[in-house]
């Protein structure tokens, strides 16, 4: 509501994305257009999904995507084609034998195995998803990180320097913070 435009919401899994989509679609279907990424999308389906961001619209488009998936990296939606990314979770990979071997390898060398096996790959997915919003120096957009772990020093140290001007707020203050951001952007222009 703070700013109409195109947004992507990135989830750590298809299951969580589907669960949130069902709730969101039931509550917001009348106030915005909603898209959802599907597993095994064919090329023409991917193209049709991205073409939705090229359309001129009066309202808001909200696209549900999987972090680290086909829309989380390698797509260029410049200018006002994408004005916001909402990132749910820290992108940590699932625990697996491969991840445990990697973690143990770095732990045995006196390094943080958790960082190398989990935190760094997860943050790479987060940064890739966030990077869909700002593609040129003229682009402006909002990036919402929805996970309290982002407040930890270990995660904050991995943020790009451009993120130094950031706000931390709870859900009750979110609308006000996002409105303030867009008001500041309009004043810049």
Predicted features, each with a name:
Residues 1-189:
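ASCE RecA-like P-loop NTPase motor cores
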């Amino acid at each position: 509501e703070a700013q109409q435009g195109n947004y992507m919401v990135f989830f750590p899994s298809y299951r969580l994305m589907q669960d949130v989509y069902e709730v969101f679609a039931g509550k917001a279907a009348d106030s915005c257009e909603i898209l959802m990424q599907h597993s095994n999308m064919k090329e023409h389906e991917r193209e049709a999904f991205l073409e939705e961001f090229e359309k001129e619209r009066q309202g808001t488009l909200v696209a549900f995507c999987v972090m680290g998936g086909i829309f989380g990296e390698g797509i260029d939606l410049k200018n006002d084609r994408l004005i916001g990314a909402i990132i749910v979770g820290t992108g940590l990979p699932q625990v697996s034998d491969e991840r445990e071997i990697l973690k143990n390898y770095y732990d045995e060398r006196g390094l943080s195995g958790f960082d190398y096996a989990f935190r760094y790959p997860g943050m790479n997915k987060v940064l890739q998803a966030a990077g869909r919003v700002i593609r040129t120096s003229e682009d402006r957009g909002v990036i919402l990180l929805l996970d309290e772990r982002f407040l930890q020093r270990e995660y904050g140290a991995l943020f790009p320097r451009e993120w130094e001007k950031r706000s931390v707020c709870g859900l009750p203050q979110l609308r006000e913070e996002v409105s303030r951001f867009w008001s500041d952007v309009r004043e810049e222009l």
